Amino acid sequence: DMAPDFKSTTQDGAALTLADLKGQRTILYFYPKDNTSGCTLEAKSLRDGRAELARMGFRIIGVSPDSEKSHRNFCAKHDLNFTLLADTDHSVCEAYGVWAEKSMYGRKYMGVLRTTFVIDAEGRIEKVFTKVDTANHYRQILDAYK
């Protein structure tokens, strides 16, 4: 299947669309919130594995509903070396089907289902990870391509 088109903004305020990703495989990972425990573990795993993933031809882009400012702080605090999209209107999350009703402590709310999509150089969805191992996510991706 072709990856859904999107238009969003990076932590530095630059516009980014699906067309901008053509020509390189992309790990597009959706996570609920900057600076929360699971999301930080996942981001650090991808940060630590970025060089190895890049050697295999992957670029990494994270997506959450946080603001550009929140993303800049998150990147600075954890030395994140990849792009984050500020999906404040959750339109990218909705396009990829990861904006959904969740439940915590009996309270229902709308939020992001932690999911990773691998998009090939032509813009097709190659793999989807719905059971994300946050602390070892980069290994989880590498293992799927061995």
Locate the predicted segments by residue.
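Chalcogenol-based redox active-site neighborhoods
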Residues: 1-146
